[in-house]
Amino acid sequence: MRLIIITGTCGAGKSTVRDHLAKRLDPDKFVCIDTDEVGINWWDYAGTDHEEHFSDDCLAEAVRLANGHDLVFVSCINPQDYIGRHTIPAEIESTVFIVLCPTDEVIYQRLQARPAERGFTTEEAIRPHIEYNQWIRKNRGKYPLFIDNSEQTEEQTATKVAEFIEGL
C-alpha cells in the first residue's frame, strides 16, 4: 500500500481538501481518511506517558480501515517526526508527503474563525501553529508537492492534489 500524507498545520485546509478528494479519487484505488475519522481521541493520550503513540495509533488504524487500498491520510504529522520517530505499519510500501501551506495571516484568520470549543481563542493557542507553518514553508523544497493555497479555492487546491495523486 502507498501512503499519501496530506499535511500542514491546523487551519491549512487539509480536511476541506479531503472532502473534495473523497468524491474525486477512484474508491477502488484510494481511501481518504482524516485523523479525526479514525476514532482515536487525543485527550486519551495528552499528558500521559504514551502521548507520543497518538500519531502511530492513528496511522495504524487508518491503514487497517484502508483495507489494502492506497491511503490518502490527512494529518498534521510532521514529516521529520514521521521519518525519525514514528512506527510505520508493515503494509506501507512507500510514503509521499503533500503539504498545504497558506500564509501565516490566512492560518491566523482561519483559526480565529473556528468555534471557541476548538481552543483557538488566544494568541498563545495560535502561535505554535503559525510557527509550525513557518517551519513547513522554510522546508518547502523537501516535499514532492507543496501548495500555498492562500489564494486558491478549495476546488482548485483539491484538483492539484488529486492530479498529483493520480499521477503517482
Regions found by a protein language model. Give the residues of each.
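Small-molecule kinase domains that catalyze NTP-dependent phosphoryl transfer to phosphate-bearing small molecules
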Residues: 117-160, 168
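Conserved substrate/cofactor phosphate-moiety recognition/catalytic segment
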Residues: 18-64
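Walker A/P-loop
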Residues: 15
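Walker A (P-loop) phosphate-binding loop of P-loop NTPases
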Residues: 11
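Switch/connector loops and helix/strand junctions flanking conserved nucleotide-binding motifs
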Residues: 104-111, 156
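Hydrophobic anchor at the beta1->P-loop junction of P-loop NTPases
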Residues: 6
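Glycine-rich phosphate-binding loop used to anchor ATP phosphates in small-molecule kinases
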Residues: 53-94, 100
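Conserved AAA+ ATPase "sensor/coupling" helix adjacent to the nucleotide-binding pocket
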Residues: 110-118, 164
